[in-house]
Amino acid sequence: MSLNMPFLKYNDNKKIRVRPDFTICLVLAVCVCIVYGQVHDFEFTNYDDGDYVLINPHIKDGLTLESVRWAFVTNHASNWHPVTWLSHMVDIELYGMNPGAHHLMNVLFHILNTLLLFMILNRMTRRIWESAVVALLFAVHPLHVESVAWISERKDVLCTLWAFLSIWAYMNYVKTSRIVHLAASLFLFCLGLMSKPMIVSLPVLLMLLDYWPLNRIPVNKISTVRDFFR
């Protein structure tokens, strides 16, 4: 009996070896853990964490009908992002008011985002090592410290997750032309909007990806549009 393990492959001598993309994903996850594992010892901050979790009665109640309703109708903290509120409520249900666990959830989302970025780039370009380098920069770049190490910035890592999943679904649509994949991409985009509105620019990004590397827009059509505006 043989086991189907997609992260393994056989060489010409029938010897098992681990696929390089699986190894890269493992290394990327370890790098994120090395850089951000320390957040487990961090506390809540006095900047926005109170509004988002610490003294927010709707969040502290966890997943109740009233709290869920509140998440979809409130513009508390000058934001409408019900999915972000719901994620904080789920944290309360799972970990209570343990700040380290809330921080580690952000780290988990960042790991998922890093792996998704690598898989998206590798799938689109078929350049595995260049994709790995870009994903590594994304994983450990200091610009992401605020988004990962600050509980109130859950909306950033959550929005990014939906954006990458939406791109992946769109790539499936490009490959298969099945409308279900396009609908999935749109649904994930809507979840991103309900996490943080900055994802609103995603359709423009998809158009750019259509040009390169998906090559769905021929160069001659770009020239025609350019000539029209001359």
Where are these regions (language model features)?
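Polytopic membrane enzymes that build or remodel cell-surface glycoconjugates and lipids
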Residues: M1-R230
